[in-house]
Amino acid sequence: MKGVKAEDVHHFLLNTEDLRHRRVSRMVEEVQKILLQVTSDISNRDSRFHCISNAGIHSDSLKVLSPSQFLVTVPLRGLSGFRQKKTRRWRYYSPSGTQLLAPAMEPEKLHQWLEIEQFQKSTPHWHDNDVNIKGDLVPARIIHVFLEHLYRAITFCSLSDKVNVLESYGPSIRLNVETSEQMVEVELVPVVEVPGYWPKKSQWPRFFKRWPLRERVQCVKSFGFDLLARSNYHWQLSFLRGERLLLEAMDDDGGCRMKCYRAVRQMKEDVWCPGNHPVINSQHLQMIFLWASERHPSAKAWKDLGRCFLRIVRRLQKCARQRFLRHYFVRRANLLKYADTAQLDALADKLSRFLQNPSLGQGASSVC
């Protein structure tokens, strides 16, 4: 197998990275400005929803999944003092509130039920029937309430020419937001923030692992986790703040992990997995890098940029071929469980051909 020289990766990043950063930063700034208006109006109408922060590309409320796909979380207010407790096992209601003869589906590995009693403090509106069924906070109902406010806010803020709500087949809110660069698809997700608490579903860190350091682990856990409203009944566990903290400190030992990550991401976006709805996004890549950092904890393993680049490409190919990628914090969850298998197979084939004759020239030429 041919190799890739470190200077080739450096040259590739020099020709592509700055352009991408400037484009994405402009789009993030414009999207945040628009959504700040919209969510501020929603917050004024319904105090249960907080407006998003406007902190640029490093905002905790916005994640760039790809240049054409953003994830924006909308914090929920009036819920505090979360505690883990054993919830009742079966639910016999639909999201609309009608009685079912058979119980609703149990949560998957990365999901859980959420009861109002799990919070030591909750404002009276969270007990209302528009979001609560038999003591459960129901994501589908919260999304429905938020969506109604969203339509009114877009009209009130005179943003109908900039923002278009997309038709959705599940409990999610997706928008097309027009920017000066291109149209961006934004998923708006209500989120319950749980700072200072670590969920039992996350058996992390694993025993006898040298990465990350104990101090970093304690810092990550102090940020807690989030619960995202992305399904009918269940709340999805999310660790975006912890992931960001680990990524930011990844090269404190002088390694080349983040340069390697940016090179793989650029090739993925330009050559291996282009388009508006890539089967692999930045969230998947970050998981791959977190696992690789745990498996190769020494600084020596991350000195040769060319070798590290190919190591990650091989790992990405393996994930695509096997259609399996463990979540870093909840390792029993497969992040590719519902991914398009045809797209994963096509990606694996592209990566196989690339590894037979690796060249970064194709990625650089597609950007120019």
Swiss-Prot record:
It comes from the Eukaryota. InterPro entries: Mab-21-like_nuc_Trfase, Mab-21_HhH/H2TH-like, MAB21L/cGLR. Coiled coil: none annotated. It holds the Pfam family Mab-21_C. Disulfide bonds: none annotated. Belongs to the mab-21 family. This is Protein mab-21-like 3. The gene is mab21L3.
